[in-house]
Amino acid sequence: MEKRILGLDPGLATLGFGVITCTQIANKVPETTVNMLDFGVIKTSADVEMGLRLCTLFDDLHTVMEEFQPDLVAIEKLFFYRMSSTILVAQARGVLILVLGQRRLPYVEFTPAQIKQALTGYGNADKLDVQEAVARELDLDEIPKPDDAADALAVALTASYQL
């Protein structure tokens, strides 16, 4: 059985997405294969009014959902030290959750520490360790760029380990 998982790294200026397929093969010992379909980012400009930025996220997220038809969406939970950053990302995250609700799509959320633990075995791993694990798990020649897209793939992989 194949599942398509969309990983999202929420952000207002840059929202990363990564799409993988997870196929379970029924042998004597069940085996799962994971393949990367696509990754990228949705960008908005700080020079544009907030409402228009959120509309861009809304429209572009619908486009991604329409193109890839995910079965499950995995989202990185908010984790910030600065309140101003948290508020901006929370607004973008609200749009994201709205799009998922409109499409009746199930979603799961993971903290940064859960993602690091799942991919590296260490909850305090650094960003490069996680990105290298993403490239290794997906059999990629290099780390996906930009970082937001690599992070989104990490979130999707974390969800695939829970299936």
UniProtKB/Swiss-Prot annotation:
Catalytic activity, EC: 3.1.21.10
Assigned keywords, A-Z: Cytoplasm, DNA damage, DNA recombination, DNA repair, DNA-binding, Endonuclease, Hydrolase, Magnesium, Metal-binding, Nuclease
Main location class: cytoplasm
InterPro entries (alphabetical): RNaseH-like_sf (IPR012337), RNaseH_sf (IPR036397), X-over_junc_endoDNase_RuvC (IPR002176)
Single GO BP term: DNA repair
Cofactor dependency: Mg(2+)
Any GO MF annotation of the entry: DNA binding
Active site: 9, 76, 148
One GO CC term on file: cytoplasm
Quaternary assembly: Homodimer which binds Holliday junction (HJ) DNA. The HJ becomes 2-fold symmetrical on binding to RuvC with unstacked arms; it has a different conformation from HJ DNA in complex with RuvA. In the full resolvosome a probable DNA-RuvA(4)-RuvB(12)-RuvC(2) complex forms which resolves the HJ.
Similarity section: Belongs to the RuvC family.
Protein's recorded name: Crossover junction endodeoxyribonuclease RuvC
Species of the source: Nostoc punctiforme (strain ATCC 29133 / PCC 73102)
